[in-house]
Amino acid sequence: MPLSAPAPRKLEHLRDIQLRGYVREDGLVDIEAHLTDTKTYGFPSEHRGQVGPGDPIHGMWVRMTINEDMLIIACEAASDHTPFAVCTGATPAFAKLAGLTIGPGFNRAVNERVGGVLGCTHLREVLAQMGTVAFQTMWPLRNRRQAAQRKAEAAGAPRKRPALLGTCHAYAPDSPVVRKKWPEWSDLAEKREEAQI
């Protein structure tokens, strides 16, 4: 259902963030973000001269290369448009994200490496969203891995706990989604086992 009709208004500022997930030929995954900020009016800038209506105030990129375990193999950032020339000096710091794993504690670890004066607020803000896109991109790859695991199970290998179990309301151990998708991992399965003991 869409939002209700707004009151009469005029657009002043637009932040556009595009997030994309790519599966590479080498099996790794690139998560890429492009952020732009524009105004609907022109204004003078001490460092850039006149910034026209629709001209980017910020035009920034981040690319993270990750493996199937959500480990960041490489990260790079670039700033095409910034309010100050010195802003581009923050982009090399984002290479320090290599070696982090996207998961619990990711945002804290990001802030330790590129927080405050070590990085750029705008580039840092998109990293949490990039983590979400990484999970959305990786899901089909994990599905294929789980399908292979199910084949191995049929041969007698034990099944691993699903990575998404317990990560949100839909994947709560007592949810209908878990009961259908992973019945052996639902709370009902645990209760059945306890009743048999």
Segments from the language model and where they lie:
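Active-site- and interface-proximal helix/loop "cap" or "latch" segments in soluble metabolic
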Residues: 13, 21, 35-197
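Short, Gly/Pro- and small/polar-rich lid/capping loops
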Residues: 1-43
